[in-house]
């Protein structure tokens, strides 16, 4: 038995000793087997610091058997080791073996890696459960390359470039379609209309603050449904206006006839009844009557009734 003080053991040598059967002082009694293990670990650490040592397959095999399978006469103190799962690679030329022993101070455990060089240009690595990264790399962040002001300036320039690209690709088509819809200078088919511009134009005519950017969240199917709904509402409104103008003309004629018969109380009735009142009160009924009579959206008929309504209000027919 040899008495070795604990302070003589190096801190980077990782050992796991059971404290059973040891006195509670700073001097532990270490057996010859334990001393041989410490010597072996010390030799491995020295080889790691000096250079990577290449051994023959027979020496590695005998050394592994000695490390992984201790003798039966070893003391009660147990040093836990993990046997790596390796595979045998048969190829020519005969492989050379190299063992690397890594000592981790944080995890307090030993990891082994075996590199098998198959040829000069290729190398197969057989590792244990713990994966080892030889050369870790890290991508530098923008905060290291550029300062805060530079990053903000780069973002602002990128936003300006994206806006310019977007305006250059869409402005000409949108402006052309908007001119067609607003002024009607050029005949066009319904498939050629930019439906988004038509929706925005209709919203602006009705006092709704809507822009093309607000419609970016809508899909093409939703734009088609909105455009179809607006078109149907526009046609329905035109039919109601035709029936409304007919009703106003009839009311003016009835008012003049009643005044001719001496009913002075009826005077001013045509002034009180406007298109807005008719639309609110019987607008849906006017649309139903127009649909039932087959009255479509006829611009000529609408213009004729509008002119006739103005003259009937000013001229006494009866």
UniProtKB/Swiss-Prot annotation:
Signal peptide (from-to): none
UniProt main location, coarse: host cell
InterPro entries the record matches: Poxvirus_A11
Alphabetical keyword list: Coiled coil, Host cytoplasm, Late protein, Phosphoprotein
An example Gene Ontology CC term for this record: host cell cytoplasm
Modifications the protein undergoes after translation, according to the UniProt entry: Phosphorylated by a OPG054-independent mechanism.
Localization (cell): Host cytoplasm
UniProt keyword annotation of Manganese present: no
Top-level taxon of the source organism: Viruses
Induction: Expressed in the late phase of the viral replicative cycle.
Family, per entry: Belongs to the orthopoxvirus OPG137 family.
Its job: Required for viral crescent formation early during virus morphogenesis.
Subunit composition and interactions: Homomultimer. Interacts with OPG160.
Protein known as: Protein OPG137
Annotated organism of origin: Monkeypox virus
Encoding gene, per UniProt annotation: OPG137
């Amino acid at each position: 038995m040899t008495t070795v003080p604990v302070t003589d053991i190096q801190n980077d040598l990782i050992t796991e000793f059971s404290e059973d059967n040891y006195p509670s002082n700073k001097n532990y009694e270490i057996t010859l087997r334990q001393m041989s293990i410490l010597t072996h670990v010390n030799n491995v650490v020295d080889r790691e610091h000096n250079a990577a040592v290449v051994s023959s397959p027979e020496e590695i095999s005998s050394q592994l058997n000695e490390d992984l399978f201790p003798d039966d006469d070893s003391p009660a103190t147990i040093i836990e080791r993990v046997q790596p799962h390796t595979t045998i690679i048969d190829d020519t030329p005969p492989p050379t073996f190299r063992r690397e022993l890594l000592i981790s101070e944080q995890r307090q455990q030993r990891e082994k890696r075996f590199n098998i060089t198959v040829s000069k240009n290729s190398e197969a690595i057989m590792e244990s459960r713990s994966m080892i990264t030889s050369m870790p790399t890290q991508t530098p962040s923008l905060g290291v390359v550029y300062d805060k002001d530079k990053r903000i300036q780069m973002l602002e320039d990128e936003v300006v470039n994206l806006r310019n690209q977007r305006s250059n690709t869409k402005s000409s088509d949108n402006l052309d379609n908007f001119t067609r819809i607003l002024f009607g200078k050029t005949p066009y088919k319904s498939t050629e209309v930019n439906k988004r511009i038509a929706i925005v134009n209709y919203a602006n005519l009705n006092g709704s603050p809507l822009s093309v950017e607000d419609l970016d969240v809508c899909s093409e199917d939703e734009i088609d449904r909105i455009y179809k709904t607006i078109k149907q509402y526009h046609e329905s409104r035109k039919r109601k206006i035709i029936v409304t103008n007919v009703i106003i003309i009839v009311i003016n004629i009835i008012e003049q006839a009643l005044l001719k018969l001496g009913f002075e109380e009826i005077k001013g009735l045509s002034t009180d009844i406007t298109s807005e009142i008719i639309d609110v009160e019987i607008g849906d009924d006017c649309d139903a009557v127009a649909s039932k009579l087959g009255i479509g959206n006829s611009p000529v008929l609408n213009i004729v009734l509008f002119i006739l309504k103005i003259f009937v209000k000013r001229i006494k027919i009866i």
